[in-house]
Amino acid sequence: MRMSSEYVGQVNSGAVSMDDATFEIRGVLIHEFTHLVQKTGAVDSNQPSCIEGMADAVRSACGGVTDANRINTALNSGAYYDENRKSGNTPCPYIWQLPYGTSGYFMNWLRTYDGDFLRKLTVSIVQLGSQWSLEKAVQYILGENYKIEDLWKEYVEDAKSENVK
């Protein structure tokens, strides 16, 4: 684990407040400590939503992300994804599979359907094994009637409504 010396320099110069730096460092630690206890089992390493997304989901659930960052990620991921997909720079066929905040904040939002979603997501990794995907995990946890495409659209709509407040 490492912290950008440029970021630390911004704290020293006063460009970043000590409170903001403390908040960010706490969030980074939550993310990295999640990896220590994370089960990835037989999940293909090409499933970045599982590894990095899960760590950011826990970070978000623990209050390690600002509301503004979470909302902006939901609202801006589409343009980022479309741009990178056109140029062939994304290994993810679906936007919700993008690692870190994009999939992570979405996973955390899915707790609105099941408050125990993140724990069950970890269980799904063991239960589904090499067949694991976020799409399959969502249906394993919430039921066959829940389509990830519809949930993603609802998540973005929720972010839009929060952004207006």
Where in this protein do the model-derived segments appear?
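General structural signal for secondary-structure boundaries
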Residues: 4, 21, 77, 82, ...
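Active-site/pore-lining binding-face segments in mid-to-C-terminal subdomains
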Residues: 82-103
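Pan-zinc metallopeptidase signature
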Residues: 97-165
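Short helix/loop segments within enzyme catalytic domains
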Residues: 61-87, 110, 115-127
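Soluble non-cytosolic domains of exported or imported proteins
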Residues: 19-28, 45-49, 94-101, 112-115, ...
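Intrinsically disordered, low-complexity segments enriched in small/polar residues
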Residues: 5, 78-79, 98, 153
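Zinc-dependent metallopeptidase catalytic helix centered on the HExxH motif
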Residues: 1-74
